[in-house]
Amino acid sequence: MPNRLSAPARARSTPAARPARPGTGPLPILASALLWGTTGTASSLAPGGAPATSIGAAALVLGGLLLFLTDRTAWSLPRVCGVRERWLLVVGAVAVVGYPLTFYPAVPRTGVAVSTVIALGSAPVFTGLLGWLTRQGRPGGRWAGATALAVLGCGVLVLGPELAGGGRAVDLLGVLLAALSGLSYAVYSLIAGRLIAAGRPSAGVMGAMFGGAAVLVLPVLALGPVGWLLSPRGAGVVLHLGVVTTFLAYRLFGHGLRHTSAQTATTLTLAEPAVAAVLGVAALDERLPAASWCGLAVLAAGLAVLTLPRRR
């Protein structure tokens, strides 16, 4: 990713500017998507009285603090970076908070399937547009084609069961909230990629942003019911979401951003609903219609276009 910050000359040769190698860029991004794909299965095991926003807030507090406390560069990053970069960290933290606070309220209005498609499908588009507007690089034809395939496959995969059953009425507020969650994801992915391209350590960037987000989201957790956290099931769900789908996944995601542009990364994470669908079939005894399996194949083709090396 081209660096547009007031960065030293070493940023011109940042790894993000070189072609992504599968082992250092796409594979960590895909691994993070695999971990995120367990979110739905894990959250479905939460106690019945646990609000979705509280589950998301608790996971963000735990995972965000782990990302911040386990990397010393995250502690010092706000002090050593410039004023402009500090503001980027603040905006990134707000965007991190914005994702669960818009996505989870969208789910009861539009359903899990529609919310997932809108949020994940819009994120690569927002990332490409924002990256172009902020002069972080114009998306190429390969990215556009792969993203179109991946978004189409994601939509058919996730919406297949609802299309087969007649679907439900569209809730415009739910659609808007889901789109805002996609925008939030795009914003903090771009900011993280920009800071990493400027030479900042990936673990420090993710730790600083998510640590700030953990502090910002604390009131949401404190003002909601917390009794469910004391049950073994509730604690287990939050441990999985906080440690696996937040701490480990975003540590991998940040490492991948060092070698992969944010535009490509947000497209690759469309693998998340594929993982969720397979887990639903394997662990929850769910059934997918033929259309969903076709969508899974199209999605895999789009991801392969981005992941496989170019022909020389």
Please provide the spans of the model-predicted regions.
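Membrane-interface interhelical linkers
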Residues: 1-34, 63-91, 104, 138-145, ...
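Transmembrane alpha-helices of multi-pass small-molecule transport proteins
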Residues: 2-10, 47-98, 124-130, 183-191, ...
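Hydrophobic residues within alpha-helical transmembrane segments
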Residues: 27, 31, 58-62, 94, ...
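Hydrophobic alpha-helical transmembrane segments of multi-pass membrane transport proteins
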Residues: 31-38, 42, 70, 90-109, ...
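Hydrophobic/aromatic residues within transmembrane alpha-helices
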Residues: 46, 55, 106, 133-135, ...
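Membrane-helix interface residues
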Residues: 49-51, 110-111, 137-139, 199-200, ...
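Specific alpha-helical transmembrane segments that line the substrate/conduction pathway
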Residues: 54-65, 104-138, 181, 263-281
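Hydrophobic transmembrane alpha-helices of multi-pass small-molecule transport proteins
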Residues: 67, 139-161, 210, 270, ...
